[in-house]
């Protein structure tokens, strides 16, 4: 598209609850990607590499296992960092599988999330993925999507594209708060 970057949207969000909210966000992501002619990958499953892929319910349970014991953590607490890592590791692995050198996340555009946590999780995910498959090196693009007017641009695009803007991060713990 621009700057010789061809984006690919990888949809993997087993943290989102309930399933209806997950479907709304997934369909909105797909609609937007299609309207822009961007490749969109639906990864309703989580694959550990050697094992068979899981469906949404199983992927949500696997995510839930990762955050067990962290249910009472506040927003921006340890639970969020574990959640970011879980999802960004899957993203790093998918990038390796597709031969993509860099990956980023829209999480970094949310004012509700800690940019430092997101960047730590992304770097750790790239490091683990590279240690497992050193011949397919990936790097995390730690871009601050909130500075230099990008937050305002995001808000304008939400309106322009009539894009669904969720009111909570997605997990049941943030929904309850």
How should each PLM-predicted stretch be described?
Residues 1-177:
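Nucleotide-activated chemistry modules centered on ATP-dependent adenylation/adenylyltransferase
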């Amino acid at each position: 598209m621009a700057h010789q970057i061809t984006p690919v949207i990888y949809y993997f969000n087993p943290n989102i609850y309930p399933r209806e909210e997950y479907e709304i966000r997934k369909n909105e992501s797909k609609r937007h990607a299609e309207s822009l002619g961007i490749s969109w990958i639906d990864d309703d499953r989580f694959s550990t590499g050697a094992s068979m892929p899981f469906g949404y319910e199983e992927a949500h349970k696997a995510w839930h296992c990762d955050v067990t014991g962290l249910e009472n953590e506040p927003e921006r607490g340890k639970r969020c960092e574990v959640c970011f890592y879980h999802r960004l590791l899957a993203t790093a692995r998918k990038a390796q599988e597709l031969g993509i050198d860099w990956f980023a996340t829209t999480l970094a555009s949310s004012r509700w999330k800690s940019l430092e946590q997101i960047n730590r999780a992304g770097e750790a995910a790239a490091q683990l993925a590279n240690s497992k498959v050193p011949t397919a090196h990936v790097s995390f693009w730690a871009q601050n999507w909130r500075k230099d007017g990008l937050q305002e641009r995001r808000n304008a695009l939400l309106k322009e594209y009539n894009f669904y803007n969720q009111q909570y991060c997605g997990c049941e713990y943030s929904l309850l708060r």
